[in-house]
Amino acid sequence: MIFDEDSSSVAQESGYMGVGSPYSSDVGRISMSDHWNKLTKPSSIKVVNHGNALNKADLIIEPLESGFALTLGNALRRVMMSSLRGFAVYGVEIENVLHEFTSISGVREDVTDILLNISMIRLKLSGMDNKVLSLKVKGPCEVRSGMIADTPDCTILNKDLLICTLDQDVDFNIKMYVNSGKGYVPAVKRKSINKFGLSDVPVNFIATNALYSPIKKASFRVESSRIGQFTDYDRLIMSVETDHSILPDEAVALAARILQDQFQQFINFDETDEPHQKVDTKDVLPYDSNLLRKVDELELSVRSYNCLKNDNITYIGDLVQKTESDMLRTPNFGRKSLNEINELLASMNLHLGMKIANWPPESIESLSKQYSEE
């Protein structure tokens, strides 16, 4: 498969064309770090669970640069589905059974059906990569995965899964071999390379299909987001369902870490090579520069700005120490103005109700001026 796209189409799509754009001859004057530092980064990652099910959740990530939600969402989804590691049964020993193409006296299901059911067992090991589980049952009864006793290092996650049905007074004894892996490994592939992880393969060992992925479902959708008056930003909503071995937000975090590790190999420059990135410690000040900005620098509606002005709120540092209740008690300040301010603060990784020690600082005017000149 070949994917090709020229810079002119990217420029048109992004709105960068003509003199002074990143795609013109002025590119040599752009600081290297500007390529990533001047992009909008998500200021909010919200996890919304589906009712009481901790294994199902939507992750809402915003704001993102236009087009980034599709790029990141597709990459995260594919990595989650294919590359996260989990545990699965990869082989069994069933007493008095030499191969899968047979039946067991007194057992309703044949061996192929039993193996299919066993491959659907979801479990989690702690402190180890492989283990042998034993199950001994006497009929008549339904044999379920919950009959495999939990141990300190092994937890069965779907205890109601039916393994087989014993219709008669028969013994059903089975050993299940568990290990860690990723993706889906069919039994035929494991047999073809003799990869069982065993020093001595038992004569009645039967390989099973192994589904290691802890992800049951993963999808995403893209919506519009806004910062202040600008609406050309993306909101990414990742919908993730796991097998209970990890939480949805953990799955997304692991996928992001895998991508980070892979992309690191493409970076062929040293970020510390840029002279302008050297920091003189005598110029380091104790406050986030955004806190020292004046509220009249924000792109607020006239109503919102006048409300702040009338309440003697001059700096963003003054604003963030107010609670939502404080703001709503301000004359003429309503829910619409509150949402506007919350969105602007979120874009700076700030929020209402913050506690800032020793505020306001002495010489706040000079500090504000110093930050504005940086």
UniProtKB/Swiss-Prot annotation:
Recorded GO MF terms: DNA binding; DNA-directed RNA polymerase activity; protein dimerization activity
Region described as Alpha N-terminal domain (alpha-NTD): spans on this chain: 1-270
Positions of the UniProt region annotated as Alpha C-terminal domain (alpha-CTD): 282-374
GO biological process, one term: DNA-templated transcription
Record note on quaternary structure: Homodimer. The RNAP catalytic core consists of 2 alpha, 1 beta, 1 beta' and 1 omega subunit. When a sigma factor is associated with the core the holoenzyme is formed, which can initiate transcription.
Signal peptide start and end residues: none
Keywords: DNA-directed RNA polymerase, Nucleotidyltransferase, Transcription, Transferase
Lineage start: Bacteria, Pseudomonadati, Pseudomonadota, Alphaproteobacteria, Rickettsiales
The protein's Enzyme Commission number: 2.7.7.6
Family listed: Belongs to the RNA polymerase alpha chain family.
Stated name of the protein: DNA-directed RNA polymerase subunit alpha
Annotated function: DNA-dependent RNA polymerase catalyzes the transcription of DNA into RNA using the four ribonucleoside triphosphates as substrates.
